[in-house]
Amino acid sequence: MKSSFEWMQDYVTIDKSRTPQEFADVLTIAGIPVEQVEYWGEDIQNVITGKITKIVPHPNADKLVICTLNMGDKELTIVTGATNVREGQIVPVAVHGAHLPGGVKIKKSKLRGETSEGMLCSAHELGLDDSLLLPEERSGIWILPEDTPVGVDAVAQTGLRDVVYEYELTPNRADCFSMVGLSREFAVLSRQEAKLPQVEVQEGSEKIDGKLKVTIDDSELCARYAARMLYNVKVGKSPFWMQQRLRKAGVRPINNVVDVTNYVMIEFGIPLHAYDYDKLAGHELIARRAKKGEKITTLDQVERQLTENMLVIADAEKASCVAGVMGGFDSEVTEETTTVVLECASFKGSSIRKTGRALGLRSEASARFERGLDSEGCVHSLNRAAQLLQQMGACEVAAGVIDEYVRPQEVRRIDFTAQRVNDFLGTDISEENMISILATLGFTTEKHDKVLTAVVPTWRIDCTEMPDIAEEVARIYGYENIQSTRPLSNISEGQEGFEHAVREHISSVLSRSGLNETVTFSFMSVDSLKKLLFKEDDAHYQAVPILNPITEEFPLMRTTLLPSLMDVLVRNQAVKNDRVAIYEIASTYRPKSLPVTELVDENREITGLLYGNRTQASWPYKAEGFDFYDVKGLMEAVLTSLGIHAQLRVSDYAPLHPGKAAEYVVGDTVLCRFGELHPQCVDNYDVAGPVYVFEMYLKDLLPLINLIPDYHKVGKFPALTRDLAVLVPVSAKHADLLNIIREKGGQYLEGVHLFDVYSGEQVPRGFVSLAFALTFRSAEGTLSDADIQQPVTDILEELQEKAGAKLR
């Protein structure tokens, strides 16, 4: 949800001495978190409105023209290549010394021999995203309304100088997905009353009765359906101020009718939809489930297959709208439309969510329906839309409203006492103060002896029980005003479980190695598994579906932590963090069967990610990037600290680079997998790789852990060393060679390590030279060459037989 600081001031008075950030802090502290504050137009200077009075061809360039502009107090001559300029137009002009987004500076110059005293600006050059512009505004100069004053600050005049807030609202606060809802909250926090718009509609002589029929066939999925009719409609552009407010909310203007429905949705949080009345067969609207095999072409001109579980709004012949998700192309409002039906309805949120997910569609409207909305506000929203269109002179309003309200919204009453709330919060707030706080939030309170009953306002669908009342009291009273108190109950010290101790131990090892622990959502999408190259028959796709996901992006319980960490990496790269070293210890979830009928399997995993530079550049040293051996070293450090001896082998794990992937195993049990992320995965996430990752499986580690360190007596006698240089095929695996040496090294072999790799001219094609250092020692006496000759011979013979090795 985005809101404009300028728009907010229609409803509340904001202290000008407070900064925009302080305004955001007030809401955040009270539980309405502001995720981001965008300062629109702050980097734009010296852009003035000017009127084109004369256009002549450039004498030295066929594709350029010379414009003379009235700037109010002077005239300017500007050369442009734009093809949409006309005499009499008012346009934004960047004069000499102007600053534009991206650090662009404008100065007086000559273009093909003619002086240009500035630049005519497009909307894009003033910072507006193309996706928020009308088609005709995406190329050429931005043409401003005819009534725009000349010679004034273009940024202020066009509403581009503003502060836009982006909120990270929790799904339960559906009431705050609107300007009015946010204004109510701020009004309470700043001890004032929100100034809500006064809605009055001047109805015309025509009546809606007899001209439109509305039927609700499925009251489970559609609780209320209200409609108004507008006639003598003139479809065109909406007012400039409305277009700008919609853009700041992230919505692209289309035409005055559609823009008004979107404007009212953002203002009141209740979606509306507009139909061309003359395109509705039988002049009838029916809220019903889709028929078997039914299809609809939606507004994006894509034909979509419907299922019998989906709610549609149909005319007498066919589906005209996917309810709450997207309208139908066949009933779209166009410039030829003269009669419009406005719809405002209350649909079941879970149904809209499932329909949107099945069709791959999500909109501002569906996001609000999914969270639930105030059914009582439907007619009020209809009237507001009719009022706005009427004020534009775009229509007349037919008398009457059709309102089918088959399942009225329940009025919630919550019983509580001041003592229970105070016990719950650890506070000492008076009963009178609680009643006063609730009253400012729209609750009415009745008292019966010591029991208070709060009547919940219809827009607060999240309040259902006493703790909700306590939360409302606490956040308005001020969390910062609640004093710390000691718990009144007896507390006994618990003991740390073994698994918890192991998790803490692993966390300590990874943190000491320079990684940061993260905590992410336990959800994922099928798309994230595809990005990581898991095949469709992979067990990772056997995921637990969520009945009420917090967003459509996360419909499943995760079966791997990798997507979560990749999302963290993407966000960090977006803000130019060039070093990411993170890990997470969390659960993954696998169903025993689908559909889920019993408790799912929950397994703890430790997943990490390394990206960027291990060390930063300094004057004598270059920066060094992470590599395969960093993740390998982390795995060895963890396993060694747990007293686990495992074998290394090549891994074929789908997300990993085929040539840079490994795993540690004990027998057939995989303890961990690690390596470089597959280049295709990196591309799928649009990350500038390489990325190194690891996964450890706690349930497989636990039975093997030996935290009692092995004791090795320090040898009293000297060791003998032998260096073996062998030629082996390049396909030979280092781990296999080590296993052969250890197996045939006999009782005196104390250690072995690879100390040289050579593949120069003296080595045959297809081979590589490996040099191993072998250490032999006896606890009983000094070894002679004869004592170790046989083990060395056995090693060479076994290497030759099993690995095709030759002694150099």
For each of these PLM feature ranges, what is it?
Residues 115-127, 138-142, 155, 163, ...:
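Mobile "lid/hinge" segments at catalytic clefts and subdomain interfaces of large enzymes
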Residues 2, 29, 440-443, 462, ...:
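A carboxyl-terminal module marker
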Residues 1-206, 341, 360, 364, ...:
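Phosphate-backbone binding interfaces of nucleic-acid-interacting proteins
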Residues 3-10, 161-170, 223-231, 364-371, ...:
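Short, hydrophobic beta-strand segments
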Residues 414-580, 722, 775-778, 787, ...:
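Extended, well-folded interaction surfaces typified by the phenylalanyl-tRNA synthetase beta subunit core
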Residues 4, 11-12, 23-25, 65, ...:
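Glycine/proline-enriched, intrinsically flexible loops and inter-domain linkers
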Residues 49-79, 150-151, 244, 255, ...:
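Conserved mixed alpha/beta core segments that line enzyme active sites in large multi-domain catalysts
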